[in-house]
Amino acid sequence: MDWGTLQSILGGVNKHSTSIGKIWLTVLFIFRIMILVVAAKEVWGDEQADFVCNTLQPGCKNVCYDHHFPISHIRLWALQLIMVSTPALLVAMHVAYRRHEKKRKFMKGEIKNEFKDIEEIKTQKVRIEGSLWWTYTTSIFFRVIFEAVFMYVFYIMYNGFFMQRLVKCNAWPCPNTVDCFISRPTEKTVFTVFMISVSGICILLNITELCYLFVRYCSGKSKRPV
């Protein structure tokens, strides 16, 4: 699945999201997906080629690079974006199911007074209520979990969010502890901190949306007649 397909799917979900959910989707596309596609390759395009170690031992440089960068930053961020966006597919499938049921009832004549034609059913905004409320809320909950897990994995895997200029490596087949130098560490640190910060903003937006949904759910229950 390419980014265009993902955008079209999430764009469909966006029609039925809350205002906070629409802000989250905007942040996701502009500050994460577009930045990753446009700028990340320029920053990390030289990561292995310009990873220099002060040894001529065959294989030492590759082993040291694999030790300090087991997964490329770009691939990890791409995987994070895919995992974070996946829960929205649950909402998209649920909305599609609801529309299918309405079309079926319309064709049988059960709800002909509610809609003029099938096209109106297709364009109608689906309200977040009933079982769809639970699906939508669950998708946001998993988004928060995935964001937090990936931030933790990133921190553990790379020993923090700041790129070091020099790293030491004594893995086999290196003859001794060798010094290895990372290309453009400051630029990569700035980019990493930016991506992590945006990820944190997305978590805050998701938590805010969860609170909003629960408050609206509770206020709706309190208004029901006893």
From Swiss-Prot:
A hemichannel or connexon is composed of a hexamer of connexins. A functional gap junction is formed by the apposition of two hemichannels. Forms heteromeric channels with GJB4. Interacts with CNST. Disulfide bonds join 53-180, 60-174, 64-169. SMART domains: CNX, Connexin_CCC. Belongs to the connexin family. Beta-type (group I) subfamily. GO terms for molecular function: calcium ion binding; gap junction channel activity; gap junction channel activity involved in cell communication by electrical coupling; identical protein binding. Pfam families: Connexin. It comes from the Eukaryota. Structural component of gap junctions. Gap junctions are dodecameric channels that connect the cytoplasm of adjoining cells. They are formed by the docking of two hexameric hemichannels, one from each cell membrane. Small molecules and ions diffuse from one cell to a neighboring cell via the central pore. One of its GO terms (cellular component) is gap junction. GO terms for biological process: cell-cell signaling; gap junction assembly; gap junction-mediated intercellular transport; sensory perception of sound. Residues 14-20, 95-135, 211-226 are cytoplasmic. Residues 41-73, 157-189 are extracellular. InterPro entries: Connexin, Connexin26, Connexin_CCC, Connexin_CS, Connexin_N, Connexin_N_sf. This is Gap junction beta-2 protein. Detected in cochlea (at protein level). Detected in cochlea. Liver, kidney, intestine, lung, spleen, stomach, testis and brain, but not heart and adult skeletal muscle. It is found in: Cell membrane; Cell junction, Gap junction. Ca(2+) binds at residues 42, 45, 47. It is a multi-pass membrane protein. Residues 2-13 dip into the membrane without crossing it.
